[in-house]
């Protein structure tokens, strides 16, 4: 009986469905023939979203970038994070938008959220910097704050930058 349960669990986990890809939001590139294609630049192979996730799921670290003002890039980052969460435990998420002085706030907000106490203004509670459009970054940050893995600062503070 145990073997049947184990095989069933393995088969069901292999059939996990990726989150739906986000709808395109921005006007940029809408008439480009390659809009939405995922291309492996090493060999020009076109990948499906599932193939991309399968290739990335065993990576120890991923560096994912975006054009800071492109809503589609932000939506795809959140999609990729959620897709990878379905395939493996995440280690942590580091954001260049977070500076060392904000880490204590991030940790405090996370504890509050887990205790069921959501701040009225999440961006303000995190001391989110105005230069990073919260409307674009907020969905990813909000999602990450509710996960079991840490959300960490990856930027240097002003004093650290000035000392270089």
Show the residue positions of the predicted features.
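A substrate-binding/cap region within the structured catalytic cores of diverse enzymes
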Residues: 92, 104-164
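Sec-dependent signal peptide recognition
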Residues: 2-8
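Membrane-embedded segments
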Residues: 68-96, 100-110
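N- or domain-start disorder-to-order transition segments that initiate the globular core
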Residues: 16-59
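Short, flexible loop segments at the rims of nucleotide/cofactor-binding pockets, characterized by
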Residues: 37-44, 70-71, 128-131
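C-terminal motif of bacterial Sec signal peptides marking the signal peptidase cleavage site
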Residues: 12-14
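Short, basic, glycine/proline-bearing loop/turn elements
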Residues: 31-38, 60-67, 119-127
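Zymogen propeptides
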Residues: 44-85
């Amino acid at each position: 009986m145990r073997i049947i349960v184990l095989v069933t669990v393995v088969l069901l986990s292999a059939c996990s469905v990726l989150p739906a890809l986000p709808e395109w939001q921005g006007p940029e590139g809408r008439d480009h023939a390659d809009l939405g294609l995922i291309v492996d630049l090493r060999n020009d192979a076109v990948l499906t979203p599932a193939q991309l996730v399968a290739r990335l799921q065993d990576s120890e670290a991923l560096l994912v970038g975006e054009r800071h003002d492109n809503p589609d890039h932000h939506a795809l980052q959140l999609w990729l994070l959620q897709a990878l969460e379905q395939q493996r435990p995440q280690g942590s998420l580091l954001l260049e938008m977070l500076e060392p002085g904000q880490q204590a706030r991030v940790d405090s907000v996370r504890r509050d959220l887990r205790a069921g106490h959501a701040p009225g203004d999440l961006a303000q509670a995190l001391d989110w910097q105005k230069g990073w459009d919260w409307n674009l970054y907020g969905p990813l940050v909000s999602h990450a704050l509710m996960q079991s893995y840490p959300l960490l600062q990856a930027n240097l503070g002003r004093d650290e930058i000035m000392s270089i």
